[in-house]
Amino acid sequence: MIIYKQGITFLQKENNNTIHLNTMFFLSPAETHQRMAAENHSFVTKFILVGLTEKSELQLPLFLVFLGIYVVTVLGNLGMITLIGLSSHLHTPMYCFLSSLSFIDFCHSTVITPKMLVNFVTEKNIISYPECMTQLYFFLVFAIAECHMLAAMAYDGYVAICSPLLYSIIISNKACFSLILVVYVIGLICASAHIGCMFRVQFCKFDVINHYFCDLISILKLSCSSTYINELLILIFSGINILVPSLTILSSYIFIIASILRIRYTEGRSKAFSTCSSHISAVSVFFGSAAFMYLQPSSVSSMDQGKVSSVFYTIVVPMLNPLIYSLRNKDVHVALKKTLGKRTFL
């Protein structure tokens, strides 16, 4: 018997004096784990979504609640886009940003909510692998785009209030179009990078996603291969797409509030504060829930808490945005009255 590297070689002599070498190799713990992972790995064709809750008695009430929210979201955002498109006096950079935000909110909600509603009324919440990756891709595109669109709108408000005489120069039609284009490009690039890294992830036999949609973190928890690069990408992009827009919005509103405080008329000051507070509330809910989900260490994160947090920035905020940004907007009210008046006259 000869010990060679990590194996043991046996010398066996047969009756015809022929010597055979039989070698048995021992695998290291790391090699053993890789071998077991390879054996357990299978090409995943579908996933099972756990949903918001597994309690059957809550499925119908939740279906009705989220159906109502989705209907309001669709009507509010498509109504805002239509109203701005039909009203010539709203064809300005400010309302171009608002129209783009409404489009993003509509798409953001539509990527997730219809599938979730179907899952409420079906016994098996199955989603195919291609469908899951497609949902994840477009979710990331519109979620990231919304982060930067809110920042662009805050900057637009800062220029309008703090530098009104230079507004038409700084926020020209060309600058507005360029900012909107950059917002979508950032969303497409970041989403493509995430999906590209997902192709290197190997999934084990476990195919149950503890979420109501194909969330990035929930999918990575099913991996039986290293997800270090994916997690590093999440950390970097979350910092860029959450912290940078948040700081932009915060600094913009600090200057806006400082300008509002210089307003002499109490009525004008109170209206401006009321408008800003509603905007800040919507932005805080969106970025706060997103940061809770993606900037929290995985060691202390809870998927149940993450699902509740996700509801706010994927479903609730897209419903609230058109209401918040138009509720105290006189131009929108005038445009709505004119549009409804024309329809009544016709």
Swiss-Prot record:
Domain of life: Eukaryota
Carbohydrate attachment residues: 16, 40
A GO molecular-function descriptor: olfactory receptor activity
Cysteines joined through disulfide linkages: 132-214
Topology of the protein relative to the lipid bilayer: Multi-pass membrane protein
BP-aspect Gene Ontology terms: G protein-coupled receptor signaling pathway; sensory perception of smell
A GO-annotated cellular component: plasma membrane
Pfam families: 7tm_4 (PF13853)
UniProt keyword Ribosomal protein present: no
Function of the protein: Odorant receptor.
Annotated protein name in UniProt: Olfactory receptor 8G5
Lineage, highest ranks first: Eukaryota, Metazoa, Chordata, Craniata, Vertebrata
